[in-house]
């Protein structure tokens, strides 16, 4: 369940409805049979190459940090540049013999100038069916230091049938999509939602789409009601075109609304009133620069995707300076991550006849050599 810091429900009357908040791995606007619903896979066991005429997106693990994509022949797959882990095919010929890869830039100038950093995608298609494993990791260079921040992210897949569009807000959320029937545009956010010109991603049409968000991803089905969502946690919402955004979203400063009553109590004291006004000016200036404690009021009915905005980060230093002090400080205050074990990064993948049959963690590769020797 999400904490109150993530979302708050505004009840306009006495009637209270139990809000549905579930962890999301796949979201579809079509009703399917249970046997057709995409399932969350715990490992890469029994993943076969897709022989059907439609692509299949399946998330792997918990959290879902890997996406398995099955693509039929001559069907284009678009993935964020540098996120492909592996490619394989069941065909007797190598997937490299028929694979075509092209770089595609999506609105590079507009995205760079107005807040969407990720505009480089790789278009991949082949004359034979193939599988691709896609990573959710995104490396970000930290300005002013010699480090890179690698944030923990997870996948959610969307199946668009043309009836609903999706508005996606984080700058690096669109990780992969399949087909040429999806339209991706970058309209400007309404002035009521941002102080500076910024764009978001609007996806419409038919096809499969995979988003990534920090931490876990949850789905909220909103009825004819209103909900407050912390800005950093809002991943995407379902909409009917770009024109619906101004009526569906509104900026809310939660601290300002909660403290209105306390201001009335000190208004009769001139000295306290002066210090209160000075504090408000400083606080408002700080929030103007940092966007702290800003919420978005979302009006239903619609579907929302929220990310828990995990703060678990690992720092990779280029020259090692400062790393010793950082880890000693983290350990002393009790926030250090547990010591990594060999099985956390040693993996054995078994491939038979072009299919991935097994995926295991090992403490040592010597164990695998002994098993093969026997």
From Swiss-Prot:
Coiled coil: none annotated. GO terms for cellular component: mitochondrial inner membrane. Residues 1-18 form a transit peptide. It holds the Pfam family AIM24. Its main location: mitochondrion. It is found in: Mitochondrion. GO terms for biological process: inner mitochondrial membrane organization. Keywords: Mitochondrion, Transit peptide. InterPro entries: AIM24, AIM24_sf. Belongs to the AIM24 family. This is Altered inheritance of mitochondria protein 24, mitochondrial.
């Amino acid at each position: 369940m999400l904490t109150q810091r993530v979302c708050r429900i505004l009840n306009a009357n006495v009637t209270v409805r139990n809000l549905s908040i579930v962890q999301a791995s796949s979201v579809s606007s079509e009703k399917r049979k249970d046997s057709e619903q995409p399932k969350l896979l715990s490992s890469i066991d029994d993943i076969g190459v897709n022989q059907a005429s439609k692509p299949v997106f399946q998330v792997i693990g918990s959290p879902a940090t890997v996406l398995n994509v099955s693509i039929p022949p001559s069907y284009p797959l678009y993935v964020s540049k540098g996120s492909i882990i592996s490619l394989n095919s069941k065909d007797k010929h190598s997937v490299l013999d028929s694979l075509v890869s092209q770089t595609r830039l999506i609105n590079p100038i507009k995205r760079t100038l107005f807040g969407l950093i990720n505009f480089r995608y790789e278009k991949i298609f082949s004359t034979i069916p193939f599988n691709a494993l896609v990573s959710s990791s995104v490396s970000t260079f930290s300005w002013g230091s010699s480090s890179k921040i690698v944030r923990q992210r997870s996948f959610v897949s969307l199946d668009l049938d043309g009836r609903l569009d999706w508005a996606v807000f984080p700058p690096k959320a669109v990780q992969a999509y399949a087909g040429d029937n999806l339209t991706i545009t970058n309209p400007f956010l309404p002035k009521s939602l941002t102080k500076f010109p910024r764009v978001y991603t609007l996806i419409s049409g038919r096809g499969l789409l995979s988003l990534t968000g920090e931490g876990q991803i949850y789905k909220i089905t909103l009825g004819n009601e209103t909900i407050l969502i912390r800005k950093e946690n809002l991943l995407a919402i379902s909409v009917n075109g770009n024109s619906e955004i101004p009526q569906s979203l509104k900026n809310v400063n939660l601290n300002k609304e909660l403290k209105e009553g306390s201001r009335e109590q000190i208004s009769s004291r001139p000295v306290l009133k002066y210090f209160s006004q000075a504090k408000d000016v400083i606080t408002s200036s700080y929030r103007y620069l940092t966007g702290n404690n800003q919420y978005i009021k979302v009006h239903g009915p619609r579907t929302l995707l929220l990310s828990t905005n995990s703060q678990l980060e690992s720092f990779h230093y280029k020259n090692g300076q400062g790393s010793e002090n950082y880890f000693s400080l983290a350990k002393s205050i009790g926030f250090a991550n547990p010591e990594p074990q060999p099985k956390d990064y040693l993996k054995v993948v078994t491939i038979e006849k072009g299919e991935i049959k097994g995926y295991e963690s090992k403490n040592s590769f010597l164990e695998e050599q002994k098993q093969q020797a026997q």
